[in-house]
């Protein structure tokens, strides 16, 4: 019983950390592509491919693109950079996406609901609900730097919540 609780707590924290790391990497990719406004589309695509290589997700991305083109023809004309961002942020089939990481963190927290503080559970649950609202209709793409800052900030809240003096 104790090892099961410890396991869920470990993975809850690990998935929150994974979401933060993904947000940092994607934010750097976004900033570098914005700073180099004169870059060609092929250079932006190479930068997006580098994100996939770092994450070891090239085959998963290619499979996702094949599936997307069958189910949603409007994504065929999407720039590779936007497709990579969407894949890394909101694809529920990508176990490394921010969506999947925060979903898994919430599920692990829910499994040990009695072992964590009410405040921590509420923070994780509200984070999940707000994430769903931001991902709806790709609203997060309207202000990506703010979205990535939000994810990074949330990971700090999760780290500091258990140590906060009451």
Where are the language model's segments positioned?
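Alpha-helical transmembrane segments and their helix-helix packing motifs
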Residues: 1-156, 160, 164
């Amino acid at each position: 019983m104790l090892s099961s609780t410890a396991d869920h707590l470990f993975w809850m924290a690990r998935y929150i950390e994974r979401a933060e790391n993904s947000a940092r990497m994607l934010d750097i990719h976004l900033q570098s592509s914005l700073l180099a406004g004169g870059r060609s589309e092929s250079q932006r695509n190479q930068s997006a491919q580098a994100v996939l290589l770092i994450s070891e997700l090239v085959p998963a991305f290619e499979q996702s693109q094949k599936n997307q083109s069958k189910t949603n023809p409007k994504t065929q004309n999407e720039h590779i950079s936007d497709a990579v961002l969407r894949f890394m942020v909101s694809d529920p089939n990508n176990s490394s996406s921010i969506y999947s990481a925060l979903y898994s963190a919430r599920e692990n927290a829910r499994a040990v609901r009695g072992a964590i503080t009410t405040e921590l559970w509420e923070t994780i649950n509200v984070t999940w609900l707000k994430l769903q609202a931001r991902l709806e209709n790709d609203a997060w793409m309207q202000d990506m730097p703010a979205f990535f800052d939000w994810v990074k900030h949330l990971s700090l809240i999760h780290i500091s919540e258990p140590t906060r003096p009451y």
